Amino acid sequence: MSKRATIFLDIDGVLHPNSVGELEYGPNGPVVVGQGVCSLQTKLAERVSGKAVDIAIHSTWIYMFDLKRLQDEYLRELSAAAKIYLTNRRIESRSLRITDYMRRRRLTLADVLILDDAPKEFASAPELLSRLVVCDPTRGIDDPAVLQQIDEFVS
C-alpha cells in the first residue's frame, strides 16, 4: 500500500454543524436525515480534488454505515474527489483508530491532518494534537481558519 497524505475526518460538527441531522431507523437500518447533512463536503472536495490526498473516516458514523453506503448516500462529492477509507471500527477510541491506521500505512505525523470537533477525544494521544484542526461544532469546516489549514496541508 502506497504512503499518501491523509486527512482524518470526523463527520458531525465537521461536515455539518452538530445541530444538523437526526438519526432514524428505517427498514434498511440507521439513516441520518435532515437538511444540510454533510453539506460542507463540497468545501473539502474542492480542496482535495486532483491532489494526492486520501480521506480516512474516524467518525462514529463508521459504526452505523459501511464504506459503500457512506460514499453512496452521504459523501458522493467527496468520493468523486478523493479515495475514502474507514478506520478500524473494532477500536473504540478515535485517537487509537487514527494511530492504528497510521501504523498500518506507515504514515508519519507530517503525512496527516485530523479534522474533528472534539479535542478531548485526543487526550490519550497527545502526539496527535499537533496535527489536529479543531472545528467549532456549530460551524464545522465552514471557518476561514480551518479552510486555510486544509489548504496549507494539501498544497
Please state what every model-predicted region is.
Residues 51-71:
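Substrate-recognition element of Asp-dependent hydrolases with the DxDx(T/V) motif
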Residues 9, 58-64, 115-117:
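Short His-Asn-centered micro-motif
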Residues 4-6, 54, 111-113:
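Structural motif
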Residues 16, 61-62, 100-104:
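Tryptophan-centric aromatic hotspots in well-structured domains and transmembrane helices
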Residues 35, 63-65, 90-92:
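Acidic-and-aromatic substrate-binding clefts and catalytic sites of carbohydrate-active enzymes
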Residues 2-50:
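Active-site neighborhood of HAD-like aspartate-dependent phosphohydrolases
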Residues 68-155:
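C-terminal cap/substrate-recognition subdomain and adjoining C-terminal extension
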